[in-house]
Regions:
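Sec-dependent signal peptide cleavage junction
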Residues: 18-26
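Extracytoplasmic "Venus flytrap"
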Residues: 27-46, 50-51, 58-76, 80-82, ...
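Hydrophobic alpha-helical segments within soluble ligand-binding/sensing domains
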Residues: 70, 136-170, 189, 231-238, ...
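Beta-alpha junction/loop-to-helix N-cap segments that form part of ligand/metal-binding clefts
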Residues: 64-126, 138-141, 261-264
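Flexible loop/hinge segments that line or gate small-molecule binding clefts
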Residues: 101-145, 164-172, 295-303, 307
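Hydrophobic alpha-helical
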Residues: 84, 90-112, 194, 216-299
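Hinge/cleft segment of the Venus flytrap/periplasmic-binding protein
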Residues: 26, 169-174, 178-182, 186, ...
Length: 361
């Protein structure tokens, strides 16, 4: 079994290197928003293996966060004979772009499987798109749940450790929120509910709501201006914050909430450089840092007591659902045949992969 898995993974890695090649006749084309996203990298590894296990030959292509590149590459793949097109849309929420791609794929009468990045901010609009082509499906999450679960986790942790987190003893907990992308549906929901649900837990227990560290910031978040949810953005922001907001000045940021684990990593690196959140958590002040995805890097940080918690976005589950549905559509089966019963099929066109809390315990 181990030898088989090793062969599958080796094959998958080889296939994933075909990122500059258009799909040939009978190959399954997977178009990625970017190869630079940590979570999507884990999905890609799992998806290549899952597709290979189903007998599909995969061509992965990096769109480098450029929608025109993605559109052009998909059109080329269709011309060269791809047997299915799997799309991780660059322009999340752009229904016009999704319609253009769907129409091109539909014209070739091959399966169109979109995943992870929403095609519209309007669920009814998305439903109409996918119901308009029987060989299509969307695999994602109930995007509000990550923020809700994160917010509840944050709120309970703060409540349980209130006095030790209140570094300046003003009776309130100051926080910073790092947002991955200004327009992305999931980023918007995580930013909203990550704080609102924490506040619900705190106020229900008679504690004040969280207070954004910078009263002049009306948005109450700092966003990656490149929309790439990157650790570079959060690192730079956190370094700048610590120069002015620190224990010496009596206004230290006491809580860090991030839209994803990569941004949590950047914040922790900046905190560590300033003497906080050191490996092991001994002999230093540890500022609670929360993320989403439960990446391997985040799990290691949590084990090292440098990070507090994350919400697991199941990369293997996402890959399994995409591979199962794609193979079913290629073979002319019911698209949801053999799908893991833990996945939620909604309205005949979309599948939600569940989230879970991860604290390392």
């Amino acid at each position: 079994m181990k030898k088989f898995v090793s062969k599958v993974l080796a094959g998958a890695l080889g296939l994933s290197m075909l990122c500059g090649v258009a799909a040939a006749e009978g190959e399954t084309y997977v178009s990625w928003y970017t190869f630079g996203d940590v979570y999507l990298s884990s999905v890609r590894t799992a998806l290549d293996a899952a597709m290979e296990a189903k007998g599909l030959t995969v061509v992965d292509k990096d769109s480098n966060a450029n929608q025109q590149t993605q559109t052009d590459d998909i059109n080329t793949a269709l011309v060269t004979g791809a047997n299915a097109v799997v799309v991780n849309l660059v322009e999340s929420g752009a229904i016009g772009t999704a319609e253009t791609l769907m129409n091109a794929i539909k014209e070739k009468d091959v399966p169109a499987v979109f995943f992870n990045r929403a095609v519209s901010t309007d669920n009814a609009e998305a439903a109409e798109l996918f119901k308009g082509y029987e060989k299509s499906a969307f695999i994602g999450t109930d995007f509000t749940q990550a923020g809700i679960m994160q917010g509840k986790m944050v709120g309970q942790y703060v409540l349980d450790h209130y006095d030790e987190l209140d570094l300046n003893k003003d009776g309130k907990i100051s926080y910073v929120m790092f947002k991955g992308d200004e327009a992305n549906q999931e980023a918007i929901a995580r930013t909203k509910y990550g704080v609102e649900c924490a506040d619900e837990v705190l106020t229900a227990a008679g504690k004040p709501a969280l207070e954004f560290y910078d009263a002049s910031n009306a948005n109450k978040y700092l966003v990656d201006l490149n929309g790439t949810w990157s650790n570079t953005a959060s690192f730079d922001y956190m370094q700048t914050i610590l120069a002015q907001y620190n224990e010496a000045n009596g206004n230290m940021v006491e809580l860090v909430i991030c839209n994803n684990d990569d941004m949590a990593l950047g914040a922790i690196n900046a905190l560590s450089n300033a003497g906080y959140n050191l490996a092991g958590g001994e002999g230093c002040t540890v500022i609670p840092v929360f993320g989403v995805d439960a990446t391997e890097a985040a799990k290691e940080l949590i084990a090292n007591k440098q990070m507090t918690g994350s919400i697991k976005q199941d990369a293997e589950g996402m890959a399994d659902a995409v591979a199962t549905i794609t193979a079913n559509l290629i073979e002319g089966k019911d698209k949801f045949e053999g799908l893991n019963e833990n996945y939620e099929v909604v309205d005949g066109w979309t599948v939600n992969i569940p989230y879970s809390v991860y604290t390392g315990e």
